[in-house]
UniProtKB/Swiss-Prot annotation:
The keyword Ribonucleoprotein does not apply. It comes from Monascus ruber. Aldo-keto reductase; part of the gene cluster that mediates the biosynthesis of azaphilone pigments (MonAzPs), a complex mixture of compounds with a common azaphilone skeleton very widely used as food colorants. Glycans are attached at residue 271. Disruption phenotype: Mainly produces yellow pigments but does not produce orange or red pigments. This is Aldo-keto reductase pigE. Induction: Expression is positively regulated by the azaphilone pigments (MonAzPs) gene cluster-specific transcription regulator pigB. The active site is at 57 (proton donor). Keywords: Glycoprotein, NADP, Oxidoreductase, Pigment, Signal. Residues 1-27 form the signal peptide. As colorants, MonAzPs are widely used in various food products for centuries. Moreover, MonAzPs also possess wide-ranging biological activities such as antibacterial activity, preventing hypertension, lowering cholesterol levels, causing hypolipidemic effects, and displaying antiobesity and antitumor activities.
Length: 342
């Protein structure tokens, strides 16, 4: 595709969390190579090139679908993440891993094989494995780096003090240092602001943030009296699935719905959707900073939804009253907001 200049304030990364073979991941909405190609067409039409995938996405099938869609031939840059699933209730998400050295090596090699590439630009440790000394993990990661299997290291879902520990260990041992931190962050989940963000700024670590729409909660699709039978099987808040229960635990409560009602009312006054309120806040009114190398991840369930998100991210700052309502809304849910780390 030809070179197109993005119109967004921040680099936008396409999250591949909804890509997968339906037989392997109940929540997959982008299930064929043709579906993936259509999603990538929409993404690249806005000038964006980075895609974020993980070993657990689609139980490994997200990577293979991206490979089949010829991500390299399209000029994309795909990053991959390794989640330590083995000691968690995540057996349904494919091959199990820890962050023990042998598993880190096996995990990265599995990433490369699935993506059909000899090297990753960015390899991310998706969460801590606190049963493995972090020094052991980082030592093996550095060996993999020195072997030329990836160019940059990222970390995600670690506590702020763990970030300090990791950065200092890497400095002390002359190991490859993390180049960015990936986190959950949105207008109604700002748990990273008091401690993690200052930590990242102190180490000049860019912040890449996901779940800008609260896992889809900040859309027109949901209401508090919505019966379970109305949820599409496998959808983000389907109470019958693992990931549905996970999102419901985080967002599906009266405090969040009270705030959602207020956002909708104020949005109508300015002809703004929930999506526009959430994404324009993140782009213009949050603690993200372009000069710090920060970026925003979006995860479209289909090309039309992705297009809506990308257009919202190209829009200007919100009216002052809307920002005030969003800030007041967060103050009301702050007491029930979960941690930013795993």
């Amino acid at each position: 595709m030809g070179s197109i200049s993005p119109k967004t304030r921040f680099p936008i990364v396409l999250g591949a969390g909804l890509i997968g073979s339906p037989g392997l991941f109940e929540g997959a909405t982008v299930t064929t190579v043709k579906d993936v190609e259509a999603l990538l067409d929409t993404f690249q039409a806005h000038g964006h090139t980075d895609v974020d995938v993980a070993r657990i996405y689609g139980s490994g099938s997200a990577e293979t679908l991206l490979a089949a869609a010829d991500w390299k031939g399209r000029g994309l840059v795909v990053r991959d993440k390794l989640y330590p699933t083995k000691r968690r209730p995540m057996a349904h998400l494919g091959t199990a891993y820890t962050l023990e050295p042998a598993d880190v090596r096996r995990g990265l090699l599995d990433c490369l094989k699935a993506l059909n590439t000899p090297k990753l630009d960015l390899f991310i440790l998706y969460a801590p494995d606190r049963q493995v000394p972090v020094e052991e993990t980082l030592r093996e990661v550095n060996k993999l780096y020195e072997e030329g299997l990836f160019s940059r290291l990222g970390i995600s879902n670690y506590m702020a003090w763990e970030v300090v520990q990791i950065m200092e260990l890497c400095e002390k041992n002359a190991w490859v240092k993390p180049s960015l931190y990936q986190s959950l962050y949105n207008v109604l989940h700002r748990a990273i602001e008091p401690e993690l963000v200052p930590c990242l700024r102190a180490y000049n670590l860019p912040l890449h943030v996901g779940q800008p729409l609260c896992g889809g909660f900040l859309t027109s699709r949901y209401r508090r009296d919505m019966p379970e039978s109305e949820h599409k099987p496998g959808s983000r808040f389907d109470p019958q699935t693992f990931h549905g229960r996970h999102h419901r635990h985080r967002y599906w409560n009266d405090a969040y719905f009270d705030v959602l009602d207020t956002i909708r009312e104020t949005g109508r006054k300015y002809n703004l959707t929930e999506v526009q309120c959430a994404l324009r806040w993140l782009s213009h009114h949050s603690l993200l900073r372009p000069e710090c190398g920060d970026a925003i991840l979006v995860c479209g369930s289909d090309p039309a939804q992705l297009e809506e998100d990308l257009l919202a991210l190209e829009e200007p700052p919100l009216p002052e009253e809307v920002v005030q309502v969003l800030d007041e809304g967060y103050a009301k849910v702050k007491a029930v907001v979960g941690p930013y780390y795993h």
